[in-house]
Amino acid sequence: VMSSGKILCSTGALLLYGGDYRLLEPLSKQLRCDGFEFMMDCPYYQEMEALKRFLQESGLYIPVVHCEKSIGENISTGKEAQWADAYEKFEMNCDIAQSIGAKMIVVHLWDGLTSDSNFQNNIAGYPRLNQIAQRYGLDLLVENVVCSVENPMKHFCELNETYPNVHFVFDTKMAAFHGQIDLLYESEYEWLWRRKQIRHFHVNDYAGGYMDWGNLRSLPIGKGKIDFKRFFDFVKKIGYDDFFTVEATAHNGAGVVDVDMLNGQFAYIRASL
């Protein structure tokens, strides 16, 4: 039986982009998750000290921080000024993670319009990010972000060839977008879990077809096509004992949060473990 305390809710599921993070306190009292994965958004750079103070004083359990997404996009471009910006911002993300006692930091190593079209830049950008993360006592996790040119599993393999100690977060939706969810169960990729290189899972459903950009949103488990019974049977079988984060958008455009839907997700995951 897995130890408890492993089910997290992404704050990105709760707040509009750059939304009022103070809403997390009242929401946390209604949500039956074990903790949160804090999603860093661009507007928060303007109020880092206030954000840090709020998160520290709130007492929210936040073992994972998800980096703001422009970092990967800047690294993809390969331009010096944008690299400098990426590292500076990444350090701010690490600083906030360390100050609230987080242990892991998730990064989109490639992102945005550039995506993985210059993947040599993303490979080259990784070590500096990892050095910064280590300085802050954080485990850096590279996510299997959707790609416009190749596919995330190919990039995981390339990263692993260059940096055999690289760690990953595996997002079920991102994998399904590329038709790669079943690769997780194949012997060719068992190094990912045998060597404990997957340190974290994002559990989101996906309703689209292969590389179906119009259907990229993260759906609640059961609202898409992913076989989650097989997924949870597998993670139990391999003895995975770390975090799962629910990211399915739970707010409507007006910012009203569907607490019941999220609590249903947490209950489903708990019952599956």
Which residues does each PLM region occupy?
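Active-site acidic/histidine proton-transfer and metal-coordination neighborhood
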Residues: 76-168
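Histidine-acidic metal/acid-base catalytic patches
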Residues: 2-8, 17-29, 101-103, 120, ...
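N-terminal pre-domain/capping segments
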Residues: 1-92, 98, 134, 167, ...
